[in-house]
């Protein structure tokens, strides 16, 4: 006769919803960051030509910016969750709309203004890269602060980087095979911006008890979601207009 074994897992060792939200955020941050990087490189190649040069400079600029963001993260000392939410919303808005902004700028600028377009391109890549670079160190610090009893430092780093690299792997495969063929570059960027914003909304609910000005944070999250959903529906018209001007 079989017996049912009692649950001997200590309550403090069970995975909390906040922990799941943060690890999911790492996966999404990595996936979205790579999408924005690939979309910028692909658009630059399409609009400016010389794909090797465009991808090399975009990827190099993005990684450099992530390094700056990681270094700057040490300056954030208080309200880590609130700061993470703000950064996540900025990444969602700027990164998600970056392909659309680049298409719009290229269609609006004179053909001779490639210099201005490059300034916008690398400026946006720098901003998104810095913001993404800020996120991962913040997530690690939040995990350590809230769930430090579950993790030694080596386990924390291992967990976070595992989800980071898994997110990058999924996007590296899906971007050329599924996302761009079915959604196009503009919708792909906006879709992943929505994912960033949804992670912010989830974290907003999970960490509600420790957030100041929760209603303001919720309103900002809702506004970003509304903008991105509207952009998703308008992406086809923008693509058609920009391609007619190309």
Task: Report each predicted region and the residues it spans.
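Alpha-helical transmembrane segments of multi-pass membrane proteins
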Residues: 2-246
């Amino acid at each position: 006769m079989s017996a049912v074994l009692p649950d001997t897992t200590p309550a403090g060792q069970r995975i909390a919803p906040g922990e799941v939200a943060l690890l999911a955020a790492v996966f999404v941050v990595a996936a979205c960051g790579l999408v924005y990087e690939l979309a910028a490189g692909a658009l630059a190649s399409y609009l400016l030509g010389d794909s090797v040069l465009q991808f090399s400079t975009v990827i190099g600029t993005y990684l450099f910016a992530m390094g700056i963001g990681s270094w700057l993260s040490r300056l954030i000392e208080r309200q880590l969750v609130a700061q993470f939410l703000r950064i996540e919303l900025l990444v969602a808005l700027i990164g998600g709309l970056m392909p659309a902004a680049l298409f719009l700028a290229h269609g609006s600028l004179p053909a001779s203004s490639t210099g201005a377009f490059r300034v916008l391109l690398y400026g946006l890549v720098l901003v998104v890269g810095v913001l993404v670079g800020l996120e991962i160190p913040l997530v690690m610090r939040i995990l350590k602060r809230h769930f430090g009893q579950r993790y030694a430092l080596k386990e924390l780093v291992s967990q976070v980087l595992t989800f980071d690299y898994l997110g990058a792997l999924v996007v590296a495969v899906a971007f050329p095979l599924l996302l761009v063929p079915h959604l196009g570059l503009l919708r792909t960027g906006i879709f992943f911006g929505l994912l960033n914003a949804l992670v912010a909304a989830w974290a907003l609910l999970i960490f509600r008890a420790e957030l100041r000005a929760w209603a303001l944070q919720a309103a900002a999250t809702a506004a970003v979601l509304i903008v991105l959903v509207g952009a998703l529906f308008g992406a086809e018209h923008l693509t058609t207009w920009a391609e007619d001007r190309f």
